[in-house]
Amino acid sequence: MSESNIVNILVTGSNGQLGSHIRRCSKQSRHNYFYTDVDELDITRYADVQQFVHSHQIDCIINCAAYVNVDQAETDEENADILNHAAVENMASIMADNGGILIHISTDYVFGGNKNNTPCNEDEPTNPTGAYGRTKLAGEQSILASKCRHIIIRTSWLYSEFGKNFCKTMLNLTSTKPSINVVFDQVGTPTYAGDLAEAICTIVEKGLDKGNEGLYHYSNEGVCSWYDFAKEIAQQAHHNSCDIRPCHSNEFPSPVKRPSYSVLDKTKFKQTFNLTVPYWTDSLAVCLSRLGNLETHN
């Protein structure tokens, strides 16, 4: 799959945050993209995926599908595992058989939180503290076990104009509530889905060389808490009437312990693919601008 070859690419979970952005940024691609979600292709059914891959001569799968409800996964781990692990194992096995490549999206939740408050690199020991992280890690491990060609990208705090996410929730709350409490003791980096999608599309356009396969980390540049993120959202959106107050995580009881520090080290990604990663506040401005345009045209 060199730069000159035309390849057939299957995007699963194409109606989600990342999939929607890949649909947008791949419009000018010379490659052939096939976009599916659960209504078009049930990735938990091996035979269905195998038939789709064979009939459309798929060279690359970009798997954006996932069970992402972190809290619900604690009482629904079986279904979380089906989507985050078993379905991934299916795709990895199929791509191993046909020699194609699987680009898979994983998460910072495979880590329990770095107690040294230093960015996590790809070699950092994993230690998921909940069902969501466990099932996502199992998905990663199934890819490695399959020996298929792969690029696994762990990301964090994904948000966008599409779907439900922290940014859109904060926009709603800060425009309707006199005050809100947001946790300050969970630190990481937001990732604008548009940036990650552009990075993935650029990797595909440059050519899926065997030397670039492996495990990578990607988020926007910078570090913040959820409280910092909320404050920046309100400031950029000019929602100045809402009093945003910092609070401890234990003030929001949750069935799963979230990582206290999960900043991802992106050095390997940037060096391998020679890509610049935008700072998180700049990307937030892009997202808010696009959200404004979407609201104007709806």
Q: Where is each model-derived feature located?
A:
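Adenosine-cofactor binding site in Rossmann-like domains, unifying the SAM/SAH pocket
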Residues: 27-49
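Conserved C-terminal active-site "lid" loop/helix of NAD(P)H-dependent oxidoreductases
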Residues: 215, 225-231, 248-287, 298
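N-terminal Rossmann NAD(P)H-binding glycine-rich loop of SDR-like oxidoreductase domains
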Residues: 7-25
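NAD(P)-cofactor binding segment of oxidoreductase domains
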Residues: 75-103
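Catalytic helix-loop patch of NAD(P)-dependent Rossmann-fold dehydrogenases
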Residues: 82, 87-90, 110-153, 158
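NAD(P)H-binding glycine-rich loop region in Rossmannoid oxidoreductase-like domains
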Residues: 46-85
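NAD(P)-dependent short-chain dehydrogenase/reductase
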Residues: 141-188, 193-202
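Mid/C-terminal beta-alpha module of Rossmann-like enzyme folds, strongest
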Residues: 199, 206-253
